[in-house]
């Protein structure tokens, strides 16, 4: 973590300039720490250009000469900041020569002598060795300098395949046979990594730049430094070259005509989408779709794997491949059974390649229009004339469809930059007016901010350019530009009269937020594919079984079967007399339940012989169902306060009865067990665990000259600086925040035997006083979403659950590289040491008392194991993206999730000092009354009813509420026959 942002930026600027002027005649002395400093601040360092700026500043010549560098010919290798010797592998997986294994914390450097200066494309020949199953990430420096921002993060794909029961060779392709559950439904196949040697050029990770990313090399000796950010990689070689771009279709066709190519006749090969042989992502597995009788295969009763893609095939760079062969060499047309019903009024784009090459320019960015229903689309030009593809017979051909932003890439890039500038303008305005300006006051905005009009005009022009480009691309008039038009019109109004900001500030903020939503949606390019038909030009491409009669009969059949199918049951369903059988309740969504069930069937039942019936239910009915004898054996995703309360009512099993519990406890941080233990009993195992972190905006802190705070005293200093600029520290009042302050100040929730509250101790009262002062003395917002204010910059530092990281990764592409996170601020102790403890909360998995206990315990041990939690976490990310990253409580599994190394280090630092909040009988009254006391102290007089307008100190309020807490604890302990305080 970098402590002084301004200092870092000065160092970065000097560092960058020094290497710009240094001779490239020797290897650089670039250290890992220096690399990390550059990567930490590259988005806010003005000395590091964007790709567009870099291209404009350098000559555009592209020499013909190519350079190939063996990976083993490196000049320097570091592990962290220490020089090391990497592992060298010879002849690995059929590859001749020596390859170098680079770790996820490595730096490897090469010296390259360039004969002719110019732009060169860089490609890596690599093998994706086993890691955390996420994309490999690297950054690239040339002669000690990060050439431009896009090279700070380059991703290299892994290759995935479906695990199948068997495969059957059909004419021209390979069909897959799926495992089935005992209801006849296809099981979703497990994806497994199928690594192979890959040659990959450097490309923009966001897809905003559709071309390869070239680098300008000076003539003479240069150094190329590759810094690992995530995942290991086996590197065989590096190439610098300039391959020719694809030619236009007319030239492609003319060249093959000249070579004697002719259309074939009467030939057709159909590739089923679900039989994709390779994909770039775990997310791209077969999809079960029963929406149309035109799909192949399809059933009104059963769930069959019959398509691929949809919402899971939406991110730039994701690709799917099929292998096929044709009986004759010649020209073929390609038809697709597709549906793009995800982005109304918009196109989605795919790059189509055959045998690793884009056949002609038009396939770099092929557009698929919106359609509510399945349709057959033949790849055609703007005049609906089918494209003809020359395909060789007698070889295995590979067809790849890759998601690209295509024509929209430049538009999206412009809008992203515009949003950043619009938020910057918003922050300038609120520094003058505050977030709630007086609409009748003249703030003299134009005089105070003379540069504002020019900035708004520049953003308006950029948005206008984006609008025009959208209209050029979208000739159907889908209306994709409406949000941008509204923003442009508002800017025109404000340019004419900047004083109107005082009246329309909320409208401006909402319009910027709408642009952010538009950006998120525009970046997604979903497409669902049923089949690919590679046919002779004289063979008609069409949907089968798609008449009105077929559709009516199919829908009536679906309706009929819906009366007999129990949709709450997932996968295999076993009777109680089929050996050991347990019932599992899952309280999350169907996607999660399907993943859990598939893991159970593939692993747990197969290994143990214990059958598990999975049911998707509302967990609020758990206690009632158990008391009625209709409950499950095991329940997952249970709230952390339930196990102890259920245990006292003899509704769940005390796990301390199992001899191997101490061994299982070692999987978790001790804090994760705290909520589930009471009076010597253990009522649950932790399933998830999360805790707060400090999120901060690098760009805004740099503007203000602020450090990332280490202590709460630092936070208070930062608050004063933020207040001067009408910004604030974002921190919503909640139990985790209060408990964090309580623990850091030496307080406890309860006394040693949990028979009374300890919140009225001096430590507890002091913690409560500090807690309330943030909202009385520093006027922090108590209700507005901190995430939204973080994005706009109103709150450039926030305290939020660490899972917020996942949300920002997905929902804030405009802030990529401009934010970071760190452990929560610490409290300075009397001896000068820092107490940085953070409170955590845990989700639980429990065994009900009326259960098959031994079988249920076997399941719980399996479910919380490292292997299972890693598989579940990766499956969820493959299904729903990084926003669904599971906050697993298993420490080893947590370390194996695909966190970038720097982010994991920050999380691990906080994970090493967390504490759980204990649960006791009547404990639900504790924070409820703390919260009541909090609002009594912090609510302004004018918001209180007249009878309640009595000024109360934090000490008085909390002391009064502790009396109520103790009364409730005493009452509950008497009900359960537990010793009472003082008796």
Q: Model-found features: residue ranges?
A:
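Glycine-centered hinge/linker elements that transmit conformational signals in sensory
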Residues: 753-783, 824
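Extracytoplasmic "Venus flytrap"/periplasmic binding protein-like
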Residues: 600-671, 675, 699-707, 796-797, ...
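Conserved N-terminal structural module of periplasmic/extracytoplasmic solute-binding proteins
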Residues: 25-26, 330, 411-416, 420-644, ...
